[in-house]
Amino acid sequence: MMPRGNAMLVGVGGSGRQSLARLASHIAGIGVFVIEITKLYRLIEWRDDMKRLFEITGVSNTPTAFLFNDTQLKEQAFLEDINNILSSGEIPSLYGKDELPAIYDGVRKRAADAESGGTAEELWAFFIESIRSNLHVILAMSQPLCPY
């Protein structure tokens, strides 16, 4: 994977898009994060999964590929969130104010080691920068099936 690299794999089902993504991730030595879609999976579950992904990449500082395919698009908001991740590294309003102190505490030591500062704004910026550096979004799309 290229630094801050992402990928979109387009092809018919069964052509090896997901296998290729997993192979590339393995070769790069990074983990793969895949969400499990169920019948009742909606925006609340999606946002919880995004928080887990951000904790892995932003707090734990673990390089991770997020593999997402078009059959997992249950709501258009999923695609909007992916667009936000790709453009800015964050999802607006993902966290409530009560969740932020745990994030700040999780990145405080690494931020201090990087001489990044210790204000809430600086810790948030460090968290987002860690996500942008560690998260690689891989979209596996099948053009005729993609509703968006």
Label every model-predicted segment.
Residues M1-Y148:
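Conformational switch/transducer regions in large eukaryotic molecular machines and scaffolds
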